[in-house]
């Protein structure tokens, strides 16, 4: 089956976007998503995004990590899809309905209200998500938030001093997190600026993670460390996060279209039906 796809990125967090709203249905398996995401033998991406018809929105967005796992939300991908759909769109996801709009070269997306209850993260057992009584070497007492997908946030003196490539996979797969977890290490520079690095569940170290920026910002606001809006700078560049309790998170940042091409999906594995 020949399909058209778009290569896009948000601050270096890159995607293969397949728009199947007006085509024959595209079957996306974990194996096929892994093959397409492979940077040596596939197209290459952090996440594969499949757009399908929706009865309640402009599109239904499904998100597959590079390891083939299907996940609930991706902030950078949402901005890219809003841009692809013309700059104003309502998008159906597993995490809920998201709305976005673009202006002055930036895309803003409402990502819903964060959740902080331990069972909404989810955690394996009850604890205070404002200062979890756990540690992995020098990383200790994280905060936790679910912003459509699960995150822990460690506030540290210097993000670059943390061996996130080593500690990230340990924390991601710890039994405390039954759905695995995205791992954020953040340094608060002042009340308007945070620096952030992210180990993304199912992906690894990434140049940018929109939901990670959101989880970190709302955690810092919750702890009284910063004001809103706050600028969160990742290795790929900055995002602006605006949030107050009782309101949805609004994330603003760029979305870049790199190229459009076609590929034969049969080269990346057979459909499950044969």
Curated annotation (Swiss-Prot):
Any GO BP: lysine biosynthetic process via diaminopimelate
Keywords, in A-Z order: Amino-acid biosynthesis, Cytoplasm, Isomerase, Lysine biosynthesis
InterPro entries, alphabetized: DAP_epimerase_AS, DAP_epimerase_DapF
Positions annotated to bind substrate: 13, 47, 65, 75-76, 149, 182, 200-201, 210-211
Residues with site note (Could be important to modulate the pK values of the two catalytic cysteine residues): 151, 200
Pfam family, one: DAP_epimerase
Compartment(s) of residence: Cytoplasm
Enzyme active site: 74 (proton donor), 209 (proton acceptor)
Superkingdom of this protein's organism: Bacteria
Cross-referenced PROSITE patterns: DAP_EPIMERASE
A single GO molecular function term of this UniProt record: diaminopimelate epimerase activity
Catalyzed chemical reaction(s): (2S,6S)-2,6-diaminopimelate = meso-2,6-diaminopimelate
Function: Catalyzes the stereoinversion of LL-2,6-diaminopimelate (L,L-DAP) to meso-diaminopimelate (meso-DAP), a precursor of L-lysine and an essential component of the bacterial peptidoglycan.
Subunit structure as annotated in this protein's UniProt entry: Homodimer.
NCBIfam families: DapF
Family per record: Belongs to the diaminopimelate epimerase family.
Protein name, per record: Diaminopimelate epimerase
Gene source species: Rhizorhabdus wittichii (strain DSM 6014 / CCUG 31198 / JCM 15750 / NBRC 105917 / EY 4224 / RW1)
Taxonomic lineage of the native organism: Bacteria, Pseudomonadati, Pseudomonadota, Alphaproteobacteria, Sphingomonadales
Name of encoding gene: dapF
């Amino acid at each position: 089956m020949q399909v058209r796809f778009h290569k896009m990125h948000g601050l270096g967090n890159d995607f293969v976007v397949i728009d199947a709203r007006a085509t024959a249905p595209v079957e996306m398996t974990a194996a096929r998503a892994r093959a397409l995401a492979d940077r040596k033998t596939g197209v290459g991406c952090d996440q594969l995004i499949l757009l399908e018809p929706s009865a309640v929105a402009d599109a239904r967005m499904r998100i597959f990590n590079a390891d083939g796992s299907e996940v609930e939300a991706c902030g950078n991908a949402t901005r890219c899809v809003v841009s692809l759909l013309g700059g104003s769109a309502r998008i159906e996801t597993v995490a809920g309905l998201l709305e976005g709009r673009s202006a002055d070269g930036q895309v803003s997306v409402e990502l819903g209200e964060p959740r902080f209850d331990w069972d909404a993260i989810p955690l394996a057992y009850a604890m205070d998500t404002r200062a979890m009584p756990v540690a992995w070497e020098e990383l200790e007492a994280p905060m936790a938030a679910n912003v459509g997908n699960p995150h822990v946030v460690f506030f540290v003196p210097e993000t670059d001093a943390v061996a996130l490539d080593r500690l990230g996979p340990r924390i991601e797969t710890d039994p405390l997190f039954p759905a695995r977890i995205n791992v954020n290490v953040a340094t608060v520079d002042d009340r308007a600026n945070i620096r952030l690095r992210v180990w993304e569940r199912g992906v690894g170290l990434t140049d940018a993670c929109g939901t990670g920026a959101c989880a970190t910002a709302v955690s810092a606001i919750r702890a009284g460390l910063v004001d809103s809006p706050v600028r969160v700078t990742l290795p790929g560049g900055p995002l602006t996060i605006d949030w107050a309790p009782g309101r949805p998170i609004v994330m603003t940042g760029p979305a870049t279209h790199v190229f459009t091409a076609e590929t034969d999906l049969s080269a990346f594995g057979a459909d499950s039906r044969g």
